[in-house]
Regions:
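Active-site neighborhood of phospho(di)ester-bond hydrolases with catalytic His/Asp-centered motifs
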Residues: 29-32, 47-57, 80-82, 155-160, ...
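Metallo-beta-lactamase
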Residues: 85-142, 239-252
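Active-site catalytic pocket residues across diverse enzymes, especially alpha/beta-hydrolases
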Residues: 66-69, 93, 170, 234
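Cap/insert and terminal regions of metallo-dependent hydrolase folds
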Residues: 163-252
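Active-site metal-binding motif and surrounding structural segment of the metallo-beta-lactamase
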Residues: 35-81, 176-177
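Catalytic core of the metallo-beta-lactamase
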Residues: 116-174
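Conserved beta-strand hairpin/beta-sheet module of binuclear metal-dependent hydrolase folds
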Residues: 1-42, 143-159
């Protein structure tokens, strides 16, 4: 399984794209930085996107990805998410006010955009990958994703505070090769992390106590203003196999 980090930050400044992970060149987990990281040619290859939740740092390049490729021959995009997230995109993003409703363009019979509802823990098979949303604990309805192919599995928590079901499923995965989870704020912002459904390094340390598998853990989601403090506090945890995702890097599992 090939994973390219298009963006891995919880905010946007030059050189820091927001959350989006590209699998095997054609499937994305979240869309915070798809059009910001990929050439037009590579954008055309992206056919399926799984959206964890409605927040802009995970959805904001969807409109531009579609707009960039609307006239490309045969282009179509399928977006998968739990019903609450699909409803949010219909009502607040592709609503003919914020952006055109591409689910009916160029016409109702052959739209370039299809919004597909997926129930929590329902598996979807795309491009040789089996992807399963799992509910986590964030400010709005949110899922992480379990991604499996014939050889391995990885788990992506998306944005979350302390959670339980995600770790239960992760611990039972065969051929687990890695976990991607978040740490958004430094410890001195614990109260803010609690009310917004995020993790600090201290809270992350408690969450990793729920992980019973000896696999690499990759961190994302840091707010650009606080990255230095977050990295220092994560290093102080002295946990082996705990590193930060690197934007632009390709990982192979």
């Amino acid at each position: 399984m090939k994973l390219k980090v298009l963006g891995c930050y919880g905010g946007n400044i030059p050189g820091h794209g927001m959350t989006s992970l590209l699998l095997n060149d054609t499937v994305a987990l979240d869309a915070g930085w798809v059009s910001g990281a990929l050439s037009l040619k590579d954008q055309e290859k992206v056919k399926d996107i799984f959206i964890s939740h409605s927040h802009l740092d995970h959805t904001c390049t969807l409109p531009f990805l579609i707009d960039n490729n609307f006239s490309a021959p045969g282009f179509s995009l399928r977006i998968y998410a739990i019903p609450e997230v699909v409803a949010s995109m219909k009502n607040h993003l592709f609503n003919k006010i914020t952006w055109p409703d591409f689910t009916s363009l160029p016409n109702d019979l052959t739209p370039v955009l299809k919004l597909v509802e997926v129930a929590p823990e329902e598996s979807v098979v795309v491009n040789g990958l089996t992807i399963r949303p799992v509910l986590v604990s964030h400010l709005v309805p949110t899922t992480g994703f379990i991604v499996e192919d014939k050889k391995c599995a990885i788990a992506f928590s998306s944005d979350t505070g302390p959670t339980h079901r995600f770790w239960e499923i992760v611990n039972g995965l065969k051929n687990l090769r890695g976990v991607i989870t978040e740490t958004s704020f430094p410890n001195e912002f614990q109260d803010l992390a609690d009310v917004s459904g995020h993790l600090t390094p201290a809270a992350l340390d408690l969450e990793l106590g729920k992980l019973k598998r000896d696999v690499p853990v990759y961190l994302y989601g840091g707010k650009p203003k606080h990255l230095k403090a977050i990295k220092k506090q994560v290093a102080a945890l002295k946990r082996k196999k705990l590193t930060f995702l690197e934007q632009g890097k390709v990982y192979r599992f």
